[in-house]
């Protein structure tokens, strides 16, 4: 496997795949990310979503797409002989990295959308995913005025803030030795035998967000002493962090992070 130029290769060098063996024993299969149990506590950090400053728009992504098709301003989506537009809905959702879209948009908290729609932030028995907020969508498609969370990756701002909070809560601070793992699915699903694992300092972990060849934040990040583990599942809109009660309380009280306890996914 080829290495990136510095600073990634010097600050976060590749290490053996066996570094994940303990996670395999603890969590089971890590194809979409090693999902840890509480250690002894846990919390879910929610991926960010955004809304146009002028508020809600009744037009959905799917309606907008079909209007463009009718006007001839976009081409039909096909796979072989299959017309995807005839059998699918343009939801507005995405996959992978995300960040604040810039002027004209604001972050929309899950708690605010829950109050607006009457939907729970995360329905009982579920995890943060595309199944949340059915009342916000029209026939499965989000309003064009909203940018829903992406699957499989933290947004950049939340990732950076997590690094800050994790650094503040450990005895070694930013010098905490950590390891990071990317699911094969986040690397193009081309190599399922040689797992991509890197080791470095927590204080240098912002670099990991921009790993060449991946459009995702790490699937797992954990302290080398195994005091905490972070998992961003490829199919979900949130990241589970397992660790001490003090760490979990710090995350729940961080104003830059939106975090919730999910007793059924503890």
Describe the residue ranges of each PLM region.
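Extended, low-hydrophobicity segments enriched in charged/polar residues
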Residues: 1-209
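Surface-exposed beta-strand edges and their flanking turn/coil or helix-capping segments
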Residues: 60, 194, 210-213, 243-245, ...
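Intrinsically disordered, low-complexity segments enriched in Gly and acidic/Ser/Thr residues
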Residues: 190-236
